[in-house]
Amino acid sequence: MVRFAAATGAALLLLVAGSSAIAAPDSRTAPMQFDVWTEGPAQTCGNACRTWVSAAGAITADTPRDFESFAKGRKLDGVTIALDSDGGSVLGALALGRAIRRLGMITTVGKTIPLTSVDGGQKRARLQPRAYCESMCAFVLLAGVERQVPSQARVMVHQIWLGDRRDDPTAASYSAEDLVVVQRDIGRLAQYTVEMGGGIDLLEIALKIPPWEPMRLLTREELQSMKVMTAADDVAEPSSGPATNSAALASGKRAPANGGGWILEASDNGPALSRSHPLTVE
């Protein structure tokens, strides 16, 4: 057995300014769920109400299968899928991304806020741009034929890691087989990134950030240069696709900050909020 501090699995740690921190809701840690929503209230947009697919929660090995079941019989070409996720399984994310690309969907980052009213069987919601796309979610974002990232959204990356060593990754022991898994998945990530038309710099930045350090927030300039974001619009505009409507879609000291996994951590620049995160198990 050997000890090492190298990249392996998939998950993230988030560092943000205290005043702008958004505590992650519990729904983001549950397995990813998909649903169809129509913009509302109806009286505010009328016939121009947009439709999108929400994708909220953690990416698991079963997520690609769940998405395929959801997509079956629906016309999703050109439809927007709004991501709100703290990442998860490497292989699950790659399979999900390829399924999204095959369907020709548009990706964005956004939190779906359901409304209480239901009009004609359509579930109404609004799409909030203040949302997170963390860890492997950033690679799913790459899958869109068009990719939109609102200025209020946060896309963050870090190294992949073996999920069963999540409790103390620096003290855990690793075998040669573990190293093989890590190298294999890094290679798959590189191939996928190029396949989706993204810049390999995305993977390079991610691999520089160990999972015990705060996640790396990608700047607007980086999102554009790495082609994580292809649309120039500053606000996510859900698209229901061409000739598609909702009916067709049918100092290192830490202190607890809140119940969402956030902690107050000392740093050279003063106190900052960071959030512990689940790690990927392959």
Name what the model sees in each region.
Residues K123, H158, G163-A248, G252:
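Charged, glycine-interspersed solvent-exposed loop segments at helix/strand-loop junctions
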Residues P31-F34, I59-D62, P169-T170, Q183-G187:
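Short acidic/polar alpha-helix capping motifs at helix-coil junctions
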Residues A7-A17:
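Bacterial N-terminal signal peptides
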Residues M32-A153, V157-Q159:
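Cleft-lining beta-strand/loop regions that shape enzyme active-site pockets
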Residues S19-A23, G92:
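Short helix/turn-capping signatures at newly exposed starts of structured segments
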Residues A23-E39, G46-N47, A231-E282:
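Compositionally biased, proline/threonine/alanine/serine-rich low-complexity intrinsically disordered stretches
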Residues A143-Q159, R188-D201, P271-E282:
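Electropositive, surface-exposed helix/loop patches at the edges of structured domains
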Residues M1-F4:
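Positively charged n-region of N-terminal signal peptides that target proteins for export
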